[in-house]
Amino acid sequence: MEQFEATSVEQAYLRWKEGKTALVDIRDPQSYEAGHAPGAFHLTNSSLHTFMQQTDFDQPVMVMCYHGNSSKGAAQYLLQQGFDVVYSIDGGFEAWARSYPQDITSESR
């Protein structure tokens, strides 16, 4: 795959429920701590190396941001780092929270 794929929040949710994809959240630390999808890896410049060590490059990766814009650049970057299949989630966390409020956790819970 040379280009990331955009995926709807519904498709992303189904992939996430199957447990076969890695889900990364690239929002700022305060937003991530306030609420994120359970099991989402908080991907930052400082955590990128850890993520790359812990994740198989042939495992699909889904990237979530605020609204589905910043995730596109991050998804393309992950492809350039060698990940085989990367998705950018359309609508980002905003769409996830609106569609699946029951599947949000926070660091304070």
From Swiss-Prot:
Q: What are the catalytic residues?
A: C65 (cysteine persulfide intermediate)
Q: Which residues form the Rhodanese domain?
A: 17-105
Q: What Gene Ontology molecular-function terms does this entry list?
A: thiosulfate-cyanide sulfurtransferase activity
Q: Where in the cell is it found?
A: Cytoplasm
Keywords annotated in UniProt? Cytoplasm, Transferase
Q: Which InterPro entries match?
A: GlpE_sulfurtransferase, Rhodanese-like_dom, Rhodanese-like_dom_sf, Thiosulf_sulfurTrfase
Q: Which reaction does it catalyse?
A: thiosulfate + hydrogen cyanide = thiocyanate + sulfite + 2 H(+); thiosulfate + [thioredoxin]-dithiol = [thioredoxin]-disulfide + hydrogen sulfide + sulfite + 2 H(+)
Q: What is its main location?
A: cytoplasm
| E.C. code | 2.8.1.1
A biological process from GO: glycerol metabolic process
Taken from the UniProt entry, a GO cellular component term is: cytoplasm
Q: What class of enzyme is it?
A: transferase
Highest taxon of the lineage:
Bacteria
Record function comment:
Transferase that catalyzes the transfer of sulfur from thiosulfate to thiophilic acceptors such as cyanide or dithiols. May function in a CysM-independent thiosulfate assimilation pathway by catalyzing the conversion of thiosulfate to sulfite, which can then be used for L-cysteine biosynthesis.
Q: Which NCBIfam families match?
A: PRK00162.1
What is the name listed in the Swiss-Prot or TrEMBL entry for this protein?
Thiosulfate sulfurtransferase GlpE
